[in-house]
Amino acid sequence: MQATSTRYEFKQRFRVPARQAYEWCTDYRTDDLSLMGEKGYRGIQRLTEDTLILTESVRTGTRTVRKRKLVKLNPKELRWYNVQLEGPFKHSTFLYHIQPEGTNASRLRFTGLIVIYSKKKLPSRRVSRIAHMERKFDAHAWVSLAKAMEREIATRK
């Protein structure tokens, strides 16, 4: 089995203060997948105050994709990351950082460091295409999450 790694990044703006955005993003609930437009199940095991294991089964067309992720939280710096322990991008790491933009807005800086496994060495064009598709998928999910966050936080006021 060959392994190749690559990275991708994007930013997502929130019309929510940074601390509130961080707290909303890291409160991990069983219905989070539906907020991203996905159908599936999320199990949450809190190991410590700053460490969780997420177990997800997501239906994509005719198949179910299972993932198990280790999540580490860093609330002081408004950062967190997850490492995929099981799933299609096993051993991949995803970094999240909420940055303030004034007092009433913030921005997520997302970095995906993915590991791609294949039987043969993948051509660089194929690796770039996979990274492009993953970036597109993740960025779209965060657009949906941003809308849900802004709607939910606005109703709390």
Stretches found by the model and what they are:
Residues 29-33, 42-86, 140-157:
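Glycine-rich portal/gate segments that line the openings of hydrophobic small-molecule binding cavities
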Residues 14-18, 58-62, 74, 86, ...:
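Beta-strand elements of well-folded, non-transmembrane domains
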Residues 10-12, 42, 65-72, 92-100, ...:
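Hydrophobic/aromatic beta-strand elements that line small-molecule binding cavities or substrate pockets
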